[in-house]
Every structure is written in C-alpha cells, then in structure tokens.
From Swiss-Prot:
Subunit structure: Tetramer of two alpha and two beta subunits.
Family per record: Belongs to the class-II aminoacyl-tRNA synthetase family.
Protein name as catalogued: Glycine--tRNA ligase alpha subunit
GO aspect biological process, one term: glycyl-tRNA aminoacylation
Organism domain of life: Bacteria
Reactions it catalyzes: tRNA(Gly) + glycine + ATP = glycyl-tRNA(Gly) + AMP + diphosphate
Length: 308
C-alpha cells in the first residue's frame, strides 16, 4: 500500500464507493445503540417488501467492552460502516471485495477468508446467515443475510455488510493500537477519543446510579408501549433503543443477575417485535410507496385475495 489512508479518508472512500453502487448515504442515528444493525435504517427497513439500499457510519456503544482506554483494541465506543441492500444483489461478495480494493487492499495479494458465523441478536428477535471476513488473520467485517428481523421473516432478503472501521484502519495504517490511528492529517484517534473512553468506562463500571437506571428502564419500556398504542412506530423504537442502552449499562455495572438478564432481553425483544409488526402495517397502509407500480399492484392484489 503506497498511501496510508486516514480514518476519515477510509470513510469517504467507502461512502463514495457504495454511493456508486446505488446506496443512499444516511447519517448516524441520534440515539445510543450497540450496533449499526439497531439503527432504524437497518432494523425497520430490512422488513417488509420495499427495496432499500443505504450506507452510513454508526458509532456503537458497548459499555461492558470499555477498558478505560488501556486496551489497544477493545472499546466502549467504536465505529461501524454499515451497508444494507434489499433485495440482496447476487454479487454482493464481489462488490465487497471491490470495496477493499478501493481502500488499497488487493484481494489477490492478501489472505481474505469468509468464516461462517451465523448472526443473532436476541434483544431484537433478529437472526441470519453470516460470515466473518478475516484479512490476514484479523476480523474486519461481518457479512449477514437477514432471515428474521423483529421476529418477522424477511422477504426479500436483506444483505448487511458491517465494516469494523477501527480494525480496518489499524490494518491499513499498520498500527498496533487504535489510539495511534491517524484520524485526520496530524490528529491521532487517541487525541479525540482516549479521554472519553476512560470517562465512559469509569462511569459504566463505577459511577452509574443503578437505581436510576432501573427506574429509567421501566419508564422507557412504558413509554414505548404507550407510543405503540397510538401507532407511533418511530418514537416507540427510540424508546426501545433507550431500553437497550440502559440494560447494557446495568449489565456493565453488574446490576443484573443471570436470571434477570434473560428477562430484560425478553422485554426488549417483545417491544421490538411489536415495533416491527406495526411498521410493516404502517407501510402497507401507505401502499408500500418505495415499490415499483407493477410489484405494488401484484402484492396488494395478493393481500386483498387473502382477506376474502
């Protein structure tokens, strides 16, 4: 590799590449979440019959993974570059490999392996066939074909490609610690994120108010249900995300027993399933506006025949 791309150049390169493949460039969703998959741009849009092609950077918070900034590769918050394409292109793997070439990684010169790793997210009732992508022995991407999202079978199938940007940048820039990654010319990753990483770790493991978090979870859960009773999918899903992040903080604090943990996950999953069903019903009422006219007419006619 002649030129070592900065972190922001990696993002710009991926944005331009996936834009050229027909993806809309979305912005990060303004709510805490543990993965880019939980953004409504993936979770909601992966269900139902409408096509959807989008790419976006998603900061992802995982309180239990915080290490006070002392671990070179494990973080409270990391960045994912998320690509979702529905229906999945038949050549999605080739498109992905071509994206690596744009980053200066020639697949013919490196050991790139697709290692089977089927994916599941119990808290949202989602699962799919998946592979980890390993580059010279290091995982850099998760590849998933969604089979179920929010408890609903996906049709058509959505392909998700999730790049781990810190790992990818560490490889491209040949550094051992994420904090040594060059974010922009002359500015290191650690100069931006090391202090927040330490502070969030300290808060998550030592300072957070368990009683307040438990109370918040109950309030967020009730508010999600209340919004759903009014048919308000998007506000409800915001509160599902808040429930998820609050649970993750409780889990990091050690405030949840093994038995309670399963119960909390089930409560989040039940809400997510209702959100998913309500979203599809909402889109159906609108006549699935992103479908082309011919497909929409066929689909709505089939639904009409089923109800007779």
């Amino acid at each position: 590799m002649s030129k070592k791309l900065t972190f922001q150049e990696i993002i710009l390169t991926l944005q331009q590449y996936w834009n050229d493949q027909g993806c809309m460039l979305m912005q990060a969703y303004d709510n805490e979440k543990g993965a880019g998959t939980m953004s409504p741009y993936t979770f909601l849009r992966a269900i139902g019959p409408e096509p959807w092609n989008a790419a976006y950077v998603e900061p992802s918070r995982r309180p239990a993974d915080g290490r006070y900034g002392e671990n070179p590769n494990r973080l409270y918050q990391h960045h994912q570059f998320q690509v979702v394409m529905k229906p999945s292109p038949s050549n999605i793997q080739e498109l992905y490999l071509a994206s690596l070439e744009k980053l200066g990684i020639n697949p013919l010169e490196h050991d790139i392996r697709f290692v089977e790793d089927n994916w599941e997210n119990p808290s949202t009732g989602s699962a799919g066939l998946g592979w980890e992508v390993w580059l010279d022995g290091m995982e850099i991407t998760q590849f998933t074909y969604f089979q179920q999202v929010g408890g609903l079978a996906t049709s058509p199938v959505t392909a998700e490609v999730t790049y781990g940007l810190e790992r990818l940048a560490s490889y491209i820039q040949e550094v051992d610690s994420v904090y040594d990654i060059e974010w922009a010319p002359g500015v290191k990753y650690g100069e931006i994120f090391l202090q927040p990483e330490y502070e969030h770790s300290k808060y998550s493991f030592e300072i957070s108010d368990q009683d307040m978090l438990l109370e918040n979870f109950e309030k967020f859960e009730k508010e999600a249900s209340r919004a759903l009773e009014e048919g308000l999918v998007h506000p409800a899903y915001d509160y599902v995300l808040k429930c998820s992040h609050t649970f993750n903080l409780l889990d990091a604090r050690g405030a949840v027993s093994v038995t309670e943990r399963a119960g909390y996950i089930a409560r989040i999953r039940n809400l997510a399933r209702v959100v998913a069903k309500t979203f599809v019903a909402e889109r159906k009422k609108l006549g699935f506006p992103l479908l082309d006219e011919a497909t929409r007419a066929i689909l709505l006619a089939e639904d009409a025949n089923k109800s007779i």
